[in-house]
Amino acid sequence: MRRTTVWLFLGAVLLVASQLVSCASAPVVIPDGITPMELVQRAQDATDKNQYDVAIQYYQAILDRYPDDIEMVCTAEYEIAFIKYKQHKYTEAKAGFTALLERYKEADAEFLPAQYKILSEKVLAKMELEKK
């Protein structure tokens, strides 16, 4: 009886360990020529599945491949910061939102999508309230 219990326990530990390992995400292969909107869609699909590390890789691809598409850059920066917030990585989230808000202090801020400024300010305010 005792031996059966030990084997059941070891089996349960192995099952849990395999589940944890399977949740770790490998680098995503992102094809060349994929548009920023396709990257956003893939990132959103990954986020919907709670595959946050995969989503961040897609958003990072926007930052790497399309640095001159300021609207997509703002989208990616906001979404990465928001994912960090959802993961309770508040220091990283705050840094991301703060860096994004710095863009809105520059001379060409009028060309930036307003929604990310508003949303970033709201999340930062919520984070401050949660600290109290």
Regions found by a protein language model. Give the residues of each.
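Acidic, polar-rich low-complexity tracts and alpha-helical solenoid repeat scaffolds
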Residues: 2-4, 22-132
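Sec-dependent bacterial lipoprotein signal peptides
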Residues: 1-23
